Amino acid sequence: METIAKHRHARSSAQKVRLVADLIRGKKVSQALETLTYTNKKAAGLVKKVLESAIANAEHNDGADIDDLKVTKIFVDEGPTMKRIMPRAKGRADRILKRSSHITVVVSDR
């Protein structure tokens, strides 16, 4: 049984979150949680929270056994980008792009 959890509008760029997502794809859930716990990146905390939510969804909604679960799919899509202006010297201005992402984790007991 596949179970999904999503975090939409996560305040980190998709490029940065994908680095962390690639670390846990295909691993057992317990091993993935341990990997994320010791990964020193902001995105690791975001992905860990979504993974824990997927585990809880599988246990509560589908009655799955946690020991059998694996991360079957994990993907990160780009979310909306907030555009901001940073004043610079001599009356100029630069555009700052504050990127966001949509994190999706799918766990399965197969």
From Swiss-Prot:
One of its GO terms (molecular function) is structural constituent of ribosome. Keywords: Ribonucleoprotein, Ribosomal protein, RNA-binding, rRNA-binding. Gene3D superfamilies: Ribosomal protein L22/L17. GO terms for cellular component: cytosolic large ribosomal subunit. SUPFAM superfamilies: Ribosomal protein L22. Pfam families: Ribosomal_L22. PROSITE patterns: RIBOSOMAL_L22 (PS00464). Signal peptide: none annotated. It comes from the Bacteria. One of its GO terms (biological process) is translation. CDD domains: Ribosomal_L22 (cd00336). Part of the 50S ribosomal subunit. This protein binds specifically to 23S rRNA; its binding is stimulated by other ribosomal proteins, e.g. L4, L17, and L20. It is important during the early stages of 50S assembly. It makes multiple contacts with different domains of the 23S rRNA in the assembled 50S subunit and ribosome. Belongs to the universal ribosomal protein uL22 family. PANTHER family: CHLOROPLAST 50S RIBOSOMAL PROTEIN L22-RELATED, LARGE RIBOSOMAL SUBUNIT PROTEIN UL22M. This is Large ribosomal subunit protein uL22. The gene is rplV.
